[in-house]
């Protein structure tokens, strides 16, 4: 098999949550433990940092990896979902896993894993851990896929746990209250391992305190902590929500230093300033065009969209254009209720089975007082927005990671840079 055939095999043979939703979700760690034992417990050969949370965990994971890279470490980074290429999920010092490694792994191991019927994420996690061990990374930043307690990354024994925040997302699996969701994400807290909590609410803070007490784990709340100031520090990530992510990371760094990581001020400044360049991070308030301004962002739930709306309010423009698509298992009405009513809307859908048809999205949007036209795919919607916009206008593309993925996959055809 070549690389593309291998990906086709993976996408068709093992259920992928990003594509099909809940039918791909496997609760429990049984498969993960079997795979881990088969591959010789590879995660035990390198240090780890475990990152969970509803929003911001990708940005925090990439930034931590960038800082450690700049400090001279060989750093693995495991995140999800990918936007353009599967290999984005598994990186060492910013470089994606080689195509040849993915092909060899699947060819060599398929007879073992096929009878297990693993989920896509279970298998991808096994590939990542084996690759990091084979390549002898010093440390790896591991982002939780979904939840925490039963996520297949939760077999690691990290130096530090980090939980960014709690908002409503994946409620069909994690629970329908903030406290229940917090309980699932608090499941990554381990005995005696420090945990940093980025943001809390009155419903979630007691959950974290109780779990930390049960595990005798030191818990540090970023919002209550005095952090070291770095005057004039620049960050490559521009979204308003990055302010809280930055505080969370700066709270975590002294704990990593106490755990023996050698991280100096220059590494911290450089990691923040060049995170996208160092790690390949995309889709976080990312500018793709100057005239008119075109920004994309992967925010896709009420918590993430609320920050985006606040940032849109700060933009000075003649007319706001919003290209939006969503998947069918989100709080669609809750998101639409947040969006500005004076924008011109371009309703579309991503190329995934979970995508909400654009006509259904427009009907729901009309109930929220939003008006616009429908387009069959992201390139058509973005092209329409470009054609109808004035140089002093502002185009925003988002609503789903998959909308941003389709945009980035077509950026050359759309003449975006």
Place the predicted regions along the sequence by residue.
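Glycine/aspartate-rich loop-and-adjacent alpha/beta segment that forms the canonical ThDP
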Residues: 400-417
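C-terminal helical cap/extension that packs against the catalytic core
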Residues: 200-220, 293-294, 302, 335-394
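Internal gly/pro-rich beta-alpha loop/helix module
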Residues: 173-180, 185-188, 193-254
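Short functional linear segments
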Residues: 1-53, 60, 66-71
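Short internal beta-strands
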Residues: 78, 194-199, 322-324, 343-351
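Extended acidic/charged loop-beta regions that coordinate divalent cations
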Residues: 81, 124-173, 205-234
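Nucleotide phosphate-binding/pyrophosphate-handling subdomain across enzymes
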Residues: 139-144, 152-162, 166-170, 180, ...
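ATP-dependent carboxylate-amine ligase catalytic core
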Residues: 22-29, 34-37, 41-44, 70-156, ...
